[in-house]
Amino acid sequence: AKSAVVIGSGYIGAEIAEQFSVTGVKTTLVDGLDRPLANNFDKTITDQVAAAFEEHGVTLAFGQKVVEFRDNDDDTVTVVTEKGEYTAEMAILAVGFLPNTDLLKGKVDMLPNGAIVVDDYMQASAPGVYAAGDSATVFYNPTGQHDYIPLATNAVRQGLLVGRNIETPTVKYMGTQATSAVQLYDLSLATSGLTRAGAERRGLTVRETSLTEDYRPDFMLTTTPVTSILTWDPETRKVKGGQFCSKADISGAANVISMAIQAGFTID
């Protein structure tokens, strides 16, 4: 294909759009939110991502919900949004996840979206029923509550725990910080725990401290800036999240934040 419209600018949609653009495919990226990776990073960082997309010729159509797909006689498809129309040889949907759990509706406790609530041993509220991965909740350590965070890392760990615990409960789930990272063009991005927007969606109050500084001293032959954002609880002063963006590989920094959240460290 020589042209494509990608609907959804989370991790999957953003990576697809990036790969299309670097291989010469004319790409349009559509999202109902006003910026890419909006559920993962603050605007300070996503502005850098948006600029990288535009530098590589990607048309950004943000703040637009898709209302229709229209097949054309020339084997193209037109994606119709609230604000415009985008025609390409293919349209790709990357709009998130929904648990496919109707089989157990009314039989086990679930979140409003259908995610099965599990205990420390991955068991649902009904005896003998276990759940893992994108069908199940995780225990989200930054909030101390059950949440729905469909990441492969969570799915792998939960699947292992089901295997260990299905006969006899022996190994408890430690919870998750939802640490993740992505490389888009020459930008390395990593995050762990809550962003300010994520906290607000959950009715929580947090503060943020941000810093942009070179990742190593100026006297080194090569260096490059790193944008760092630390999220913390103003009452307990506990670390609740961190975000990083740089042309240097800063993915390991998110692991440090993850450890700090898990251990209950404060900013002091």
Label the predicted regions.
Residues 135-248:
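Mid-to-C-terminal Rossmann-like scaffold of FAD/NAD(P)H-dependent oxidoreductases
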Residues 68-76:
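Feature captures the FAD/FMN-dependent oxidoreductase FAD-binding
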Residues 59-61, 130, 207-209:
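General small-molecule cofactor/ligand-binding pocket signal
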Residues 68, 121, 229-231:
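Short, surface-exposed charged micro-motifs
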Residues 81-84, 225:
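Glycine-centered tight beta-turn/hairpin loop motif at sheet-sheet or coil-to-beta transitions
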